[in-house]
Amino acid sequence: MGARRESGLHSFLNRKTPPTADMQQGSGGTRPQPFSRFTYGSKSAQSSGGMGGQVACSPKGRGSQRSLLSSNFPFMESVFEDRTAAPQRTPTPRDERSEYFGEAEGSSGLRSSLQCNRELASLDKINDAQARMVVVAGKSHLGLYKFDEAYRMQQVHDYMTPGSLGGGTKFSSSMRRNMRKISTISDVKAGFHHHKNYIAICGTSTSVSIYDINRASAKDSPLITTLSEHSRSINSVDFNMGQTHLLISGGQDGCIKVWDLRSHSYKVNRSDLNFNSGSDSVRDVKWMPTYDFASLGADTSLCSSGRSNKFASVHDSGLLLTFDMRQPNQVERKINAHSGPGLCMHWHPHMDYIISGGRDGKCALWYVGDKVNSMVSVPQGHNSATSYSINTAPITTGYLETVINTSHPVSKLKFRPKYVHNMLNSLIATSSMGEDSDVTIYSLARKHIPQNILTTAAPSLGFVWWNEDIVFNIDKQSVISAWDIRYEPTLLDNLPKGIVKWRDMDGSGLVFVAQEKGTYSMDNGGVTDSVGKGAANRMSNTTLNSTNNMGRDQEVFTYSFQQQYKHQDQEAADRESDHDKELEKERETEVDQHYHYLREQEREHHQEYQEWEHEPFGRHDDHQGNPQTDFYSHAYSDRPMLSKALSTYSSKIASPILSYYGAQTLSHHTSIVSNSPSISGAALEYPGGIESPIMITLDLPQVFGSVRASRLADRKTSKNKGNAPAVRESAVDIFKYLVRELELCHVQERNDPKSISVDDRSKSLDDTELKIQLMENIGLSEHNTWATLIRSTTSMDTNDPAGSHTQGHSKLVDMVKLQGSNILSPDNSDMEDDLGDKLDEMGTARLQENVNHLVGLIFLSTHNAETYASVNDLQNFKIWMLIRDSLLNDLKEAADGSTGRRDASGGAANSDKNGIYTTTSTVNHARQDSITSNFSSFEPSDISRSDGEEKLNLGRLSEQNLKATNQNTTAKLDDTRKLASSSSLNSSEPLLLLEGGNQAKEQSIGLSDLKTCLKERYTASNESVLDIEEESSATVAYSSKQANTECSSSIPIRKTEARTSFIDTIMTNLRSPGLSHLDVDNDAIFGKGKTSTSLGSGASKRSSMHSTDSYHKRPYSSPITYSKITTAAQKAKLGLADHDGLPNRGSISFLANIDAAHADKLLLGKLGLASSPDDGKLLPPWDTGRLIQQLYRYSVETGNIILTVCIILLFQTMYKVTSTRIVKSTLAEFITILHRYEMFEISAHLLKNCPWDDILGAGSGQSTVRLFCENCGKLIVNEHSKTILSKRHQAGESNMTNFGYWYCDSCRKPNSLCVYCEQPMKKLALSFLNCGHGGHFECLQQWFLDEGMSECPSGCSGVLL
């Protein structure tokens, strides 16, 4: 956009004929260079010795003393530019601008900028059209800057530097010292008319300094006087526009002082009027302006004498006060405008409106006209005292018309000095505190979208409207810039007409926004439409989540504008002069339409106005109470309120913006609906002509779910389970259902593995029954090794003393640490026997722990698979079945490991040390023979039943299947496994040395032992391997066939051949990815005439899946030494020449040329095995840890939140899925999502069972809860009572327990009572989201849990449980 803006501006500057006079080239034929946000063209400050005739002379003599409340004031023609003195830039409509702007619609409206070398704080314009000057004040700087027609600025004088005063004038040292020392400036203002050469500055000092800019060349000092009656720093100062001799100031001491520059009071530092607000600091004070709009076709009758007598102030407490000097003993209006400190305020140029800004980031527009006083009787007391306190003044009326919400505290705001017929067409410029470096211009007709944003390089410190189009601004980088808003692009110019965005989890789809851009102005048609539809609308006001809109009712709004427009339009119709004839023609249609509309509204509502005005204040049908309460309830309850969710409101005291008029006197327990009419379509809230945007949503999961459900409907052969819910239509409902039904965490994961005792005797009979049921489901017989182990460990837990296994395990670990590598030395045979016993004892204990954990994970995986099956999510169902199958394989290996360990410990005749280590190594090789395993015939994917219900068929393997296996074949298979384990480079000896803690001998046992072992065993076992494999394959195929036949009699299953598990189906290609790219010489391996026997018969899927070629490629069935090495790259890796062939079967001498580490890396890659970085173990592709890792990466890449959290919580402790930092961050974000969907019970369960305690604080400290009193509507702070109770507590009284936020210091009433016991809620309390009621935790526990109730105790209609 920046490039387009610069190119457009360049094309505009190079045009030959500019459209307006002031666009011509300035002196010297130069134009301002293009200006960027971060680069400023620094111009040298030029000083002149004198100001010539550009500045009017100072009045030489003072006039006679006049009354302070004089009603005569001059017209303010000097405020506006002299049209004859300088060419006026005529406003160019956007369609005309396109002729010379071309594509430069985004060109900047910045006219010029000037870098100053002094610190700046505030600025104002010199109210002389011919002067073309602004005054800028800062710390030790008070400069006067002049600009030309092209708004190029230069410094004229610096009144804090004596050298710049010119003429070689000599000053005394005291005078020079007074001039150079100046405090930090808070405000600077210039006078009007006869005092337009006066400048008043104020700051951190307690005085107001007044300078005369015409005394630049005089011998005396430009400092006229110093007003020092304030006791603290002064925040604001302002000159009166009508009575130009009046000056007003307000400071931190809470005093507002009025000074008359004609009298002698200011010479003795005594103010003429003093208004004391106590300790409430004054942040800003302004006189009511009296602009002269007569030359612009305005009604001069509005410029009455009363306007120059009024002023307003905004205070630290958020109060907005209006005063009238003719009644100095009282506050005209006292409005609680902001919930925090008020920072600034400004009057409308010609209407009775005030806009205020505060630290709460709100710009509130208030109507303070006389029409309010005509309907509200205000006591007219008279007192001769000129100083009084406003602390006792009651909160009075003030109509809030609209609120502009900003994201930063509003420090400066000013109305655009332009006459408008419609209040909504007024522009407001604002600047904020902090790092927001923009000056934002809003239109009241479009308060949510700014019209212009003047982007500056540093945060703005202040700005001023030079006229209705030019804005001067200063920032923290001491840069003065001039902007022309007519050439500044609006936000609507860059606003796309259609928007397509991705929705969040609430919809998980697309959202389309179609809208008309509209404009920033309000036409008459819009007023008619919006006001006419306000009377019929009603708004409900609930107790907790209520929406209340503030503003004046439509009748008062129309009536107040009637009186103004009736005179203005009539006067405008009668006036047609030469200089404004063109303007009157443009306004003629608008005036006629608006006038007729007001007449029609007046006739229509005249009777209603009379009844409303003359109705007694004390009479009201809906409210009972004292006259003051009824007055507020009647007069202002019909005013809509600003949106704010509060528990309740009161109508007795007018509260801040957050809880203003329209309050209800009834209790929130009985009052649900308000009788207040809503003017949601009123002119000040929703301008006409701007249609509301249309939002269209597309729920993609719902669409895809419907398509998937329609396609799967024809394939269903059975109905859903009886207890399974129907398919949800909403993605949010599915998310909530899955989170509630899935087992997200395992309870054992919460405990530290080091603190888990093996002999935990807390296991009940139910745990044993669950394990027996699992044995029956997976087909293990009662006499199986794992079943025997379960019974033995159960009885052992009952009889064995506590801590025996744990102590044995700790002793064994200590022994291994002390002995180190000497345990396996030949001289320690006795110690090896003891180590064998200890190893067996430790293995049994650890095996029991692993078995218990695996059993729990298997149950959880099965439950999660069933949950996904209930919602027809087949993809996640298969994932969890895949996890369960892998866990079942680990469970079987644990049982096989226990058998091998017992055989090794009981076989004393076997003197070979490799006997123990070989069995241990066999356990570490996960699923070495999955094809011959009985688990391979397990059918977890069969989810159908003959009875028509969709159910997970876990299958069964009978006891006869285990007995049918030939014992001789099993013995041969054991030898084959030993051979396979010893044939790999990761031999059993280095593996056990790593497990025993001796890593030093890993290098000593190298290729020599491996080559010797291979030479001795290969020749004798080469032929037997094939025979054993073929025999076992045929036996397993026959056994599987027989098992399916026998199981069909007891369990209704499909009559199909043996099917493969998910592991065999999905991971077939992952068996040996490295060997799949090598050509295997079958003749060299099996010999001539030998073929492999198929594992299945007939048309079985298993036989087609495991063909002879794929079967020979398995790493545990075909030795790697007999693969063909065909390519030169493969030969180079193995150290072979191109002419070298494969060695014969009896020789493996080529291995001597291969480095051990290189061979390990090469062969592990060819075998498709991964080496664990922690312990160096080999991990096959179907290893559970690798499977969990792959599923975790898949869930993260696809954005499956639930699957990711489940994997982390269930398997992080056992399989180390990812880093702990990522786990904690993921859980914290997931808990935030659960809180967003109000699933607090699931979140509490996760926090209770997760093993990371620091997750418990996730999301804390990020929310701010603000409590408002339901009686007075004010923010509950209770600082006063806290101070008192703290002092008493320090004195020895123990009464701090009474402090809390259950009461309000302002109204001295309890905030809310318990709905059960009707007592103040001092302790732990709960609140209902449905109805907003609350009560003590103990009371609600008794009501819902003990008494079994489901409704709210207050008797409301909501069912909570």
Curated annotation (Swiss-Prot):
Keywords: Metal-binding, Repeat, Vacuole, WD repeat, Zinc, Zinc-finger. GO terms for molecular function: zinc ion binding. PROSITE patterns: WD_REPEATS_1, WD_REPEATS_2, WD_REPEATS_REGION, ZF_RING_2. SMART domains: WD40 (SM00320). Residues 1-104, 564-593, 896-916, 953-982, 1091-1113 are annotated as: Disordered. GO terms for cellular component: cytosol; GATOR2 complex; vacuolar membrane. WD repeats lie at residues 180-221, 229-269, 277-315, 337-376, 405-452, 455-493, 849-890, 1146-1192, 1240-1278. GO terms for biological process: positive regulation of macroautophagy; positive regulation of TORC1 signaling. It is found in: Vacuole. It comes from the Eukaryota. Residues 1091-1101 have a biased composition (Low complexity). Residues 566-593 have a biased composition (Basic and acidic residues). Residues 39-48, 64-73, 958-971 have a biased composition (Polar residues). A zinc finger (RING-type) spans 1314-1356. The keyword Zinc applies. It holds the Pfam family WD40. Belongs to the WD repeat RTC1 family. PANTHER family: GATOR COMPLEX PROTEIN WDR24. May be involved in a process influencing telomere capping. This is Restriction of telomere capping protein 1. The gene is RTC1.
